[in-house]
UniProtKB/Swiss-Prot annotation:
Location relative to the cell: Plastid, Etioplast membrane; Plastid, Chloroplast outer membrane
UniProt-listed GO biological process terms: regulation of monoatomic ion transmembrane transport
Taxonomic classification: Eukaryota, Viridiplantae, Streptophyta, Embryophyta, Tracheophyta
Domain of life: Eukaryota
Function: High-conductance voltage-dependent solute channel with a slight selectivity for cations transporting triosephosphates, dicarboxylic acids, ATP, inorganic phosphate (Pi), sugars, and positively or negatively charged amino acids.
The protein's name: Outer envelope pore protein 24A, chloroplastic
Quaternary data: Homooligomers form large rather nonselective pores in plastidial outer membranes.
Cytoplasmic side: 1-2, 28-31, 64-69, 103-107, 132-143, 168-169, 212-213
TM region positions: 3-12, 18-27, 32-41, 55-63, 70-79, 93-102, 108-117, 122-131, 144-155, 159-167, 170-178, 202-211
Family note: Belongs to the plastid outer envelope porin OEP24 (TC 1.B.28) family.
Keyword Membrane: yes
GO cellular component, one term: chloroplast outer membrane
Keyword field contains Transmembrane: yes
Name of the gene encoding the protein in the UniProt record: OEP24A
Amino acid sequence: MMKASFKGKFDVDKSGSVASLTFNAGNAKLRATMTDASFVAGPSFNGLSLAVEKPGFFIIDYNVPKKDVRFQFMNTIRIAEKPLNLTYIHMRGDNRTIVDGSFVIDPANKLSANYMVGTKNCKLKYTYVHGGIATFEPCYDVAKNMWDFAISHKLYGGDNLKATYQTSSKMLGLEWSNNSKSTGSFKVCASMNLAEELKPPKLTAETTWNLEL
């Protein structure tokens, strides 16, 4: 089976698009992704990436024009019968390594950590889900010694509203999204820097279409 998806992003300054094709190869998946840079000046390798994925185990991405490889490995172990999800990511070109972990205490509570190896970049996050509808996520940035906050609420019909606030940049964000596994998804975002003079919020919109071929 082959699946195709098309993603378009639109904002005041610029617009862009991404198309991908995914093929099932046994218990693995092969994926080719192209951006609009692949076609602007005629067909080219610009914006082309190739990937092989075994869901839940690994993803290997190859950026064709940059000749760069990104490795991602996933694993789950159990501590006191509770899952600890671990992800290891290495970008060869940037020589960066990221370790990410999340510990699911119960369906309503989760602890997460994200650390870039060799730096002070580390974020700690707590996720609380109330009644399966409302989610509250405080996040502590160790390097900046700052807190970020996110609150989201599920609505009828699959819609989701989310508000975020970054204390370091004083950036306030609002997001309305809807995700459908069969047809696709959309997301509309508005952001405003509260540290600057009063300006109209910056608006962006994303939409994704999924097809089975």
